[in-house]
């Protein structure tokens, strides 16, 4: 399977944010997207996730599972917000996402306790999400990536609020996903430690 971006452009209001962005990622490959604030990193991820229509160009899958035409159907999107209900427990939040997303063809997610263990927080899944620190909340949002299988991970500043040990833990999750043949696109201001990752620097436009 290959994730293809072909001549993508996008606008914010009347302003063109980026133009003619193209890349191809095969199974087991990662792309790290860098650039200053306002360069369009988050917008690019939203276009890839199918949350925003591009001004031009297209996103497509090549040699993907039968019946799946757009990457959004096979993607996890982790944005700046963690997409968890503060009043629900961690376990309830992860259960919702596991059931809502289900598994894509070619793999299966792991159990809730196992996922919480993978992010180092198995002993607090009974707590309301809102009780957790910012770093713990981000770790639990990462657990959402592994309770339901999606071959494509689209990650916006994934290590925000994480300490050094959690950074390493996250890098391990990504490495395991790539080893399974997954694809990762991550926008960041910080080094992510993805061995062998491709890179895309976005500069934006001066208006």
UniProtKB/Swiss-Prot annotation:
InterPro entries according to UniProt: AAA+_ATPase (IPR003593), ABC_transporter-like_ATP-bd (IPR003439), ABC_transporter-like_CS (IPR017871), ABC_transptr_haem_export_CcmA (IPR005895), P-loop_NTPase (IPR027417)
Gene3D superfamilies assigned: P-loop containing nucleotide triphosphate hydrolases
EC assignment: 7.6.2.5
Protein residues bound to ATP: 35-42
UniProt topology in membrane: Peripheral membrane protein
Catalytic activity: heme b(in) + ATP + H2O = heme b(out) + ADP + phosphate + H(+)
Location of the protein in the cell: Cell inner membrane
GO cellular component, one term: plasma membrane
Gene Ontology MF, one: ATP hydrolysis activity
First-listed, main subcellular location of the protein, grouped into a coarse class: membrane
PROSITE patterns cross-referenced by the UniProt entry: ABC_TRANSPORTER_1, ABC_TRANSPORTER_2, CCMA
UniProt GO BP: cytochrome complex assembly
Limits of the ABC transporter domain: 3-206
One Pfam family this sequence matches: ABC_tran
Keywords: ATP-binding, Cell inner membrane, Cell membrane, Cytochrome c-type biogenesis, Membrane, Nucleotide-binding, Translocase, Transport
Chain's role: Part of the ABC transporter complex CcmAB involved in the biogenesis of c-type cytochromes; once thought to export heme, this seems not to be the case, but its exact role is uncertain. Responsible for energy coupling to the transport system.
Oligomeric form and interacting partners: The complex is composed of two ATP-binding proteins (CcmA) and two transmembrane proteins (CcmB).
Sequence similarity: Belongs to the ABC transporter superfamily. CcmA exporter (TC 3.A.1.107) family.
Protein name in UniProt: Cytochrome c biogenesis ATP-binding export protein CcmA
UniProt organism field: Rhizobium meliloti (strain 1021)
Lineage: Bacteria, Pseudomonadati, Pseudomonadota, Alphaproteobacteria, Hyphomicrobiales
Gene (name only): ccmA
